[in-house]
Amino acid sequence: MKLAPAFPRSYFMGRFWAGNTTGDGLEQTWLDGYYRYTKRGKVFARKTELNNWSLIFPSELSHDWRNLPLDQISFQHWAQEGGKIKHHTVLTKAHSKVALLFAKKELLLAVQKILVKETLSLLPGIIGDKWVSLDLMQVCSDLVIKLNARILYGPAYADDQDFHKRLITFANGVDGINSIYFTWPRSLWKIVSLVHPTIRGFYANLPHLKKRMLPDIRSRIAKLQAKAAQGEGKVPASDEDVTFMTALIKMHMEEGTLGEQDSDLEKVCMEAVFYTYEFWGPIMPTLFFMLMAIGKNPGYLQALREEISSALESNDWSSDFLARTPKLESFIREVLRLYVPAQWLITDIHRASLATVSRRTEKPIYVQSMDMHIPAGVNLCVPAKYIHRDPDFYPNPTTFDGFRFYDPVTNNVTIRATTATDTYLSFSHGSGLCPGRVFGAHVVQVLCAVFIMEYDVKVDPSKTFPDVQSTKEGRGDGMVGTTDILIRKRTSAKV
């Protein structure tokens, strides 16, 4: 068995390049590993929570495994076996298929109309004609959770603030309870789950979500069955049809995976709830950094405003205007490259991963490029944050360049915001490429466009621009810098 040169003895023990695994030195340890091993085409290992191991590959050498079939290597298994997710939510194939379904233009434009309508009705109550300092993270959270409830579940949930709070409690808790479990041996998890107040609170919240949603799920099943009996084309679509929850139910019905028992419906309910983790979780901080980047770099505001205005022209917000905004698409790709370098995981604020293209081996695999045998149960990943900030790939990589991917000669983007490459891994790569990337990027661009056209924003130059620092293995858990922004309504806004 030939292994990476970083590991001279047994498979892991003795091959573990230690450094700091927690605390302030963690990011420097990863950076050192990147230049000592990744840049030299070598693999290095890190010991993570619960004595698990991760092998960190150079991106170009992940080709051998990132497209392997799910029975050999799986992102979902990495996500669910990494902690306790599988104990409250079982994700099915239908779950991912719905995310892909909402990447279709017809549904994107239907969602876009909802986004603009709800955003324009909510923000005037917060933002007036005078400059006001707001906690932008909180504004984005409040806005996105409302949109999250409306688009994922339906209009009846859009103004239910208790429901919104419970959704956020769930989304934060998915990683929050894992962080607690990871501080204890796996053998003690059952006891910890019984006595720790955070874990008890997380699970105590679930019955409330189910009580709110299960009657609605049963009602939607009955309506979908009635539509099927009448012929779907004869029944007008309702507002609740343009929701992830209805689409998920319909997908399960079509695939014959929708059981009739209460326990089966509860599983569908938790799958639907989990969409909040995947919607509010990454969309909220991405929108936050988009607006903060505009506030810090006011030169972009006018250029983006002119582009969006031209794209809208005589059309309204329901038009496919994003097809004509290459500068805005370049802008979001740069935000995703620099400020949101990998999959976002949520805690009290949020977390940003140091690595992506995360997989867990289901069976022993062989990596031909490294002549390397890897046993089952090992986590594999790529150091995305450091690739994204490598000057060999991006000139002046730590400097924000909103039009880095815009070509003024052709007036087009050089690469789409959601396209993965070996040096751009915000949405992972290979078979685990984020199925919701097109939908998520579209939502953020629409919301950002509304802000650009309706509001002026600026950042106090005396305050430190926000960033995320990692102090726990594989995750960032601390926001540094300001989350405040100055904002006011434009006097000549486009409604």
From Swiss-Prot:
Its cofactor is heme. Its EC number is 1.-.-.-. Pathway: Alkaloid biosynthesis. Disruption phenotype: Abolishes the biosynthesis of communesins A and B and leads to the accumulation of aurantioclavine. GO terms for biological process: mycotoxin biosynthetic process. It comes from the Eukaryota. The keyword Transcription regulation does not apply. InterPro entries: Cyt_P450, Cyt_P450_E_grp-IV, Cyt_P450_sf. GO terms for molecular function: heme binding; iron ion binding; monooxygenase activity; oxidoreductase activity, acting on paired donors, with incorporation or reduction of molecular oxygen. It is an enzyme of class 1 (oxidoreductase). Keywords: Heme, Iron, Metal-binding, Monooxygenase, NADP, Oxidoreductase. Heme binds at C434. Gene3D superfamilies: Cytochrome P450. Coiled coil: none annotated. Cytochrome P450 monooxygenase; part of the gene cluster that mediates the biosynthesis of communesins, a prominent class of indole alkaloids with great potential as pharmaceuticals. Communesins are biosynthesized by the coupling of tryptamine and aurantioclavine, two building blocks derived from L-tryptophan. Belongs to the cytochrome P450 family. This is Cytochrome P450 monooxygenase cnsC. The gene is cnsC.
